[in-house]
Amino acid sequence: DETTASWLESVGSDPGDWSGLKSDPEAALLEHHIFDAAALEPQVAAPHSPANAAPVGDAPATPVDVAYIGACTGAKYDDLKRAASILRGRHTATGTELMVAPSSRRDQDRAADEGIMKIFEDAGARILPNACGICAGYGADRLGENVTCISSTARNFKGRMGAASSHVWLASPYTVAASAIAGRIADPREFLRAGDEA
């Protein structure tokens, strides 16, 4: 779509003629769905599979020990900007650690230049290096025993982010930021303010 083409151009790539990227007319499709993404409720995926997705309103208000905005899938510049809009002027809940690992140095530098990284720091976040790290269960920040985490990563299989006894919920950066403030799985719409992106 136009949004994708604009992004490709913004990072110096030629989107080419993407208008030709579609299914063959005779392709057999099992089902065809059209969704209005703006009308969808924020989703979370319960442990231990991304397939366990449900509207955030249907999820229990599970307390979270760690809120993680990171990885190549959930900490790009736009993700950081959106999460910061929830966190601006707020602080993480007592007992909940917010960790932020921007997806790339370019995104981190841009976010820093625009004051976004400062919003994370002021909210009590710990900034981690641009690396797979906790997402892949590497390093000192991997999840410990019986830790409950809400994460903007793409996978939440048992033991992927650390100890096999940890529980990882997947969510958007908006939902992760809201949950860091609430100290539990929270609907980000409770925290949006006038002028915030939806």
Model-inferred region functions:
Residues 1-198:
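Fe-S-dependent hydro-lyases/dehydratases of central metabolism
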